[in-house]
Curated annotation (Swiss-Prot):
Superkingdom to which the source organism belongs: Bacteria
Short name of any one Pfam family annotated for the protein: Methyltransf_4
Phylogenetic placement of the source organism: Bacteria, Bacillati, Bacillota, Clostridia, Eubacteriales
Species for this entry: Clostridium perfringens (strain SM101 / Type A)
Positions contributing to S-adenosyl-L-methionine binding: 44, 69, 102, 125
Protein name stated in the entry: tRNA (guanine-N(7)-)-methyltransferase
Family of the protein in this entry: Belongs to the class I-like SAM-binding methyltransferase superfamily. TrmB family.
The encoding gene: trmB
Length: 219
């Protein structure tokens, strides 16, 4: 369902201290945009309403996070959810940057100098038609871009409800010289300890759909 346009979204975002309106300006220098420049940097591609980032960021002040989505109408909800989580935990909100960016052009805002240590991809569009598969966030065309700014040994954490996307992504990762270090086709019964449930994950689980999850390490 298409989200209704919110004309107030961009003004609210631009008044936010952790919103970055022009991320291209920081390419190669992201560490210096954070208060603690020595923290590792993790990246979430497609942060949605920010449920995942709100929990991760507030639980791990020793990690800096970049959260990306394309629509202001979504980002403004992420902003509010992140602020709420930090306020409830009485944490300083100084380790998250929220920004608008088309993920297909992720290489216009990040490069090898940014040394991203982990990427999260949660419930991305499966693009099931053959002619659209190159749009997948796990497609080799994208993985090649991620490799440029992901450190050696860096990880991609990938969750999905879609069986076909998951199985084909396994081949994508192997093709692009990633090692699968963890895999489960039933995350909620796997015993995996630190799983933050997103809004999509909760919805799919209630429908009886098993959640697939893997960790891929850059070789």
């Amino acid at each position: 369902m298409r989200m209704r346009r919110k004309p107030w979204a961009r003004p609210e975002l631009e008044a936010c201290d952790f919103f970055v309106a022009n991320p291209k300006e920081n390419k190669g220098n992201w560490k210096n945009t954070f208060k603690n420049t020595e923290n590792p940097i993790y990246l979430e591609l497609g942060c949605g309403k920010g449920t995942f980032m709100a929990v991760h960021g507030s639980d791990h002040p020793n990690i800096n996070y970049i959260a990306i989505d394309i629509k202001d109408e979504v980002l403004v909800l992420a902003k509010r959810n992140i602020e709420k989580a930090y306020e409830e935990k009485n944490k300083a909100l100084d380790n998250v940057k929220l920004m608008p960016q088309e993920i297909a052009l992720i290489d216009t805002i990040l490069d090898s100098n940014d040394k991203i240590e982990r990427i999260y991809i949660n419930f991305c569009n499966p693009w099931p038609k053959d002619r659209h598969k190159k749009r997948r966030l796990t497609h080799p065309r994208q993985l090649t871009k991620y490799r440029d700014f992901l450190v050696d040994g860096g990880e991609i954490h990938f969750k999905t409800d879609d069986d076909e996307l998951f199985e084909e992504s396994l081949e994508y990762f192997k093709e692009c010289n990633f090692e699968i270090t963890y895999i489960t086709r039933d995350l909620h019964n796997s015993g995996y300890e630190y799983n933050v449930v997103t809004e999509h994950e909760e919805m799919f689980s209630k429908q009886g759909i098993k959640i697939k999850f893997l960790i891929a390490k850059k070789l």
